[in-house]
């Protein structure tokens, strides 16, 4: 499925979604796994 690596000032998180939560300073790197 599509997974996004969501980076913030608190660390890196992986979400099994097509995008990261908006409006919280996340950077998005998505890939198909």
UniProtKB/Swiss-Prot annotation:
Main location: secreted
Gene Ontology molecular-function annotations: ion channel inhibitor activity; potassium channel regulator activity; toxin activity
Transmembrane segments: none
Keyword Secreted among record annotations: yes
Keyword Transcription: no
Matching Pfam families: Defensin_4
Cell compartment(s), UniProt: Secreted; Nematocyst
Cellular component annotations (GO), alphabetically ordered: extracellular region; nematocyst
Cystine pairs: 6-30
Keywords tagged on the record: Disulfide bond, Ion channel impairing toxin, Nematocyst, Potassium channel impairing toxin, Secreted, Toxin, Voltage-gated potassium channel impairing toxin
InterPro entries for the chain: BDS_K_chnl_tox, Myo_ane_neurotoxin_sf
Protein family membership: Belongs to the sea anemone type 3 (BDS) potassium channel toxin family.
Function: Potently and reversibly blocks mammalian Kv11/KCNH/ERG voltage-gated potassium channels. Acts as a gating-modifier toxin that shifts the voltage-dependence of ERG activation in the positive direction and suppresses its current amplitudes elicited by strong depolarizing pulses that maximally activate the channels.
Protein name (Swiss-Prot/TrEMBL): Toxin BcV
Species whose genome carries this gene: Bunodosoma caissarum (Sea anemone)
């Amino acid at each position: 499925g599509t997974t996004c690596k969501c980076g913030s000032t608190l660390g890196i998180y992986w979400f099994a979604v097509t995008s990261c939560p908006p409006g919280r300073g996340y950077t998005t790197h998505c890939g198909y796994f």
